[in-house]
Amino acid sequence: MPIAARVVSFTLPARAGAVPAAILFAPGNEASEAEADAIERSMGAGVSAGRGTIRTRRVPVGSMGALTGYQVAFVTTGLRGEQDNISAVAARSSVLTISSDPACVQAGHCVVGIATSPRVQITVSRAAARAANIRFGSAFLMLVKEI
């Protein structure tokens, strides 16, 4: 998730201090739990993102509430049926949603999609970003694919 940390560092206004991040997952869904494990391992005790430090916490999708207190939400694989609800909650709370599922971004449910194979590709949904009031620096937007 070092790529995700870079994405967060390009948000405007810049985030400073602790940047709470929810890892949304579906308990009992192997793919979702495996991705949540991988995110936790890669983030460890916290990852620097510009002047901020991303600190993650697992949140079962059924218990996400309003995502109050979170600035970022990692949307794991296996949550397609929940993406519409996640998007609505994230938009109300101005939470930056990041997923490895390209369909989440294409549908406008996630703000950022990160693919790492065959090469790194970052996609930003203008509609999801606008709905959640998420803005990025112009230098970042020149490096990514906007849809």
Language-model segment annotations:
Residues 1-147:
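Short hydrophobic alpha-helices and adjacent helix-cap/hinge residues
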